[in-house]
Amino acid sequence: GRQLPNPEAHWLEAHTRSFNYPDTGRTVQLQDKASLGIKACFLSNSFAAYRLQALMAQGGFPAHLPLGEDTFTAAKLLLSGQSLRYQASAAVYHSHNYNGLQDFQRMFDTGVFHAQNPWLLQNFGKAEGEGAKLVKSQWAYLKAQASQPHHPNFLQGIVQLLSANVMKLMGYKLGRVHQWLPKALVKKFAMNKVFWQPKQ
């Protein structure tokens, strides 16, 4: 389903929701990865339904990930010949006003997820390309909206855009090489602290 930004969402977060969750539905199959790349297996972990038989045929949800169980499962389903349906007419309000540190931590976890699941990027392509598209879209949105009421002025918006995306990129890149970092530092960088606790 479609995620809409909460009324109090920051402009960057509101735009990211509209970028990731357009107002037009679509059905995605494995061959669509040629045009969609990593976005082919993009799925909402907070608003999705699964056919139980198809899900269990893939072993159900993975038990030990820092995040990304939705993307992991969607990719496995596509690779098994299943289709994904994005239903834009079904919508919920769901967004986060993360600060810079939280942006860093969230993307650090994403980097860890990609580093520990190289098959995902091997099959669907790198995430950086989609990130670059988002930044370009944010820039275009900022230029179009900067003069409107309730939007940041242009210079303030540039600072917000740059700072948020620099923190995200740094977090992601460090997450990709987390195995080379001191464990104490990894725990500080991670948003999902439980993932790094000793397993029982």
Where in this protein do the model-derived segments appear?
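Conserved donor NDP-sugar-binding/catalytic core segment of glycosyltransferases
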Residues: G1-A14
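Short, flexible, basic/aromatic active-site loop/helix in glycosyltransferases
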Residues: G1-R2, R17-A40
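Conserved nucleotide-sugar donor-binding
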Residues: S44-G59
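Active-site phosphate/pyrophosphate-handling residues
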Residues: Q53, F72, A91
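Acidic donor-binding loop at a coil-to-helix junction in glycosyltransferase catalytic cores
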Residues: L67-T73
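Short active-site alpha-helical segment characteristic of glycosyltransferases
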Residues: T73-K76, Q82
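Active-site-adjacent helix/loop segment of glycosyltransferases
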Residues: L84, A91-K168
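Juxtamembrane C-terminal module of membrane proteins
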Residues: L161-Q200
